[in-house]
C-alpha cells in the first residue's frame, strides 16, 4: 500500500509542524526537527512520506495531486485560493495580518482617500481586496520579503504583513494601524485523494483532530 504524501512548509513553521506530526504519530525520526537539505523524506513505519517546500508551493503540490495532504498557513490559502479541501485548523503558529504605518504619521491622513498611497506586501490579492472594500485606491507593491523596510526607504507609505510578536515592526519604527485578519496552520487535502483514499486519510485526520482538542484543553487548564 503506497504511503500518504504530505507537503510541509519550510521556514518558520517547519519545526512546530514536525513536532505536531510526531505527537500525532504520523512522522518518525526520519523527519528531522531541524530543517535540513533533504526535501523528500519517507517514514515507513507511519506509512507517510513528506515533501518539504516553500509555503506558497504547498497548496500547488496538493491541488495537482503530487501530495495527498498539506500543512500550510491560512494566510497562504487566503492569498492563493487553491482548489483544495481545507479540513482542519491545527491551531499553532498563530499570527495576525496587520496594516502598519511609520510611527508619528497620522493614519487617518494616509487613509483619507485624498491621495493614492503605496502599500508594500507579500499578499497583493488580499491587500487589494481590503482597500477595495473600504473604497480606497492604492498602489500595491509586491515584495517577497523585508516588507518592514519599505516605508523607511521611501518605497511605500504603508505595509500589510503578518506579525507574531510585533518586534520587527517596532525595530523598524512602525505601528499597527489596524488588525485585518488572523492566521494559523491548516490541514488541506487534494480533492480526489480525499475521496479515493478516505480509508487512509480519514484516520490520520482524526488523529490530528484529537491532538488539536488535547492541546486546546491543556492550554485552558
Swiss-Prot record:
Q: Which InterPro entries match?
A: ATP_PRibTrfase_cat, ATP_PRibTrfase_CS, ATP_PRibTrfase_HisG, ATP_PRibTrfase_HisG_short
Does the keyword Glycoprotein feature in the UniProt annotation?
A: no
Q: Which reaction does it catalyse?
A: 1-(5-phospho-beta-D-ribosyl)-ATP + diphosphate = 5-phospho-alpha-D-ribose 1-diphosphate + ATP
Instruction: List the record's Gene Ontology CC terms alphabetically.
Output: cytoplasm
The EC number(s) attached to this protein equal: 2.4.2.17
Major location (coarse):
cytoplasm
Q: Which GO terms describe its molecular function?
A: ATP binding; ATP phosphoribosyltransferase activity
Print the keywords alphabetically: Amino-acid biosynthesis, ATP-binding, Cytoplasm, Glycosyltransferase, Histidine biosynthesis, Nucleotide-binding, Transferase
Q: Which GO terms describe its biological process?
A: L-histidine biosynthetic process
Q: Where in the cell is it found?
A: Cytoplasm
Pathway entry = Amino-acid biosynthesis; L-histidine biosynthesis; L-histidine from 5-phospho-alpha-D-ribose 1-diphosphate: step 1/9
Subunit structure of this chain's protein: Heteromultimer composed of HisG and HisZ subunits.
Record remark: domains: Lacks the C-terminal regulatory region which is replaced by HisZ.
**What does the sequence similarity comment in the record state about its family?**
Belongs to the ATP phosphoribosyltransferase family. Short subfamily.
What does the UniProt record say this protein does?
Catalyzes the condensation of ATP and 5-phosphoribose 1-diphosphate to form N'-(5'-phosphoribosyl)-ATP (PR-ATP). Has a crucial role in the pathway because the rate of histidine biosynthesis seems to be controlled primarily by regulation of HisG enzymatic activity.
Instruction: Give the protein name, as stated in the record.
Output: ATP phosphoribosyltransferase
Q: Please state the gene responsible for encoding this protein.
A: hisG
Amino acid at each position: 500500500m503506497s504511503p500518504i504524501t504530505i507537503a510541509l512548509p519550510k521556514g518558520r513553521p517547519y519545526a512546530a509542524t514536525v513536532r505536531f506530526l510526531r505527537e500525532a504519530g504520523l512522522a518518525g525520526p526520519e523527519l528531522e526537527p531541524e530543517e535540513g537539505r533533504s526535501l523528500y523524506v519517507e517514514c515507513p513505519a507511519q506509512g507517510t512520506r513528506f515533501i518539504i517546500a516553500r509555503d506558497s508551493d504547498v497548496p500547488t503540490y496538493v491541488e495537482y495531486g503530487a501530495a495527498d495532504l498539506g500543512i500550510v498557513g491560512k494566510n497562504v490559502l487566503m492569498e492563493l485560493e487553491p482548489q483544495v479541501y481545507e479540513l482542519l485548523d491545527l491551531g499553532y503558529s498563530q499570527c495576525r495580518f496587520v496594516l502598519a504605518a511609520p510611527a508619528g504619521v497620522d493614519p487617518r491622513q494616509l487613509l483619507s482617500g485624498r491621495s493614492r498611497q503605496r502599500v508594500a506586501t507579500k499578499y497583493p490579492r488580499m491587500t487589494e481586496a481590503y482597500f477595495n472594500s473600504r473604497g480606497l485606491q492604492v498602489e500595491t507593491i509586491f515584495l517577497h520579503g523585508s516588507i518592514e523596510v519599505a516605508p523607511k526607504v521611501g518605497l511605500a507609505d504603508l505595509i500589510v504583513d503578518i506579525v507574531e510578536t510585533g518586534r520587527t515592526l517596532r525595530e523598524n519604527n512602525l505601528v499597527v494601524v489596524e488588525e485585518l485578519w488572523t492566521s494559523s496552520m491548516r490541514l488541506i487535502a487534494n480533492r480526489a485523494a480525499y475521496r479515493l483514499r478516505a480509508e487512509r486519510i480519514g484516520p490520520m485526520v482524526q488523529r490530528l483532530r484529537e491532538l488539536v482538542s488535547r492541546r486546546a484543553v491543556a492550554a485552558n487548564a
